């Protein structure tokens, strides 16, 4: 299953949007809260010695929050890449299209935060990410819960997030089919954030505990998938202990 590619005018609108200047919403606290939440999840999940590539790295804030020594960011926007170089000169950033960039190196961890909502071809994105993944590497991919589409649009009007062109909104079945076609399989996933705002006590209670409960987890803002190439699961050979009774 390949989702219908957006009309050419719509694709041009997205590419023009990505080429625009790096900017923050009028009230950036919700965006920062979401970024910090994802950073916390990645810090806990990505191995410390992993070579990390973030596709759609923007100004580099998420990549900088990771403790890994080897960190590379790719972004379509030249102004975002320039700003990332300025903010974090010790990290590596390069300009590139998520669907067609090429790197000689293979990475242990590839991060793609909400990219599937904006690229013109989700399958091509997944295939390119997989092509840059080390044999036993992992892709960390996030996407919004489709139930939040209307609240997120209201957030744009309220200045809580940047206004974007029309987005891809894919159901779980569509995503699973796309993962399979790209030769990927889900290792695990995690639903995160019932309340994407820093409200003392309440946010911690909802996001840390209530969001993990059955059924209620389906209302979370976004899902973090951990993917691997199909057929690369690490298998451990069985161990056998042989005990031979003997008489001294």
Regions found by a protein language model. Name each.
Residues 157-174:
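Acceptor-substrate binding/catalytic loop of class I
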Residues 238-241:
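Cell-envelope/extracellular polymer assembly enzymes that use nucleotide-activated donors
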Residues 123-135:
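A short glycine-rich, Lys/Arg-flanked "PGG" loop and its adjoining helix->strand segment in the class I
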Residues 1-46, 140-162, 200:
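Conserved class I S-adenosyl-L-methionine
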Residues 111:
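A conserved beta-strand element that flanks and buttresses the S-adenosyl-L-methionine
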Residues 58-99:
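Class I SAM-dependent methyltransferase SAM/SAH-binding core
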Residues 117, 244-248:
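Active-site beta-to-alpha loop of glycosyltransferases that engages the nucleotide-sugar donor
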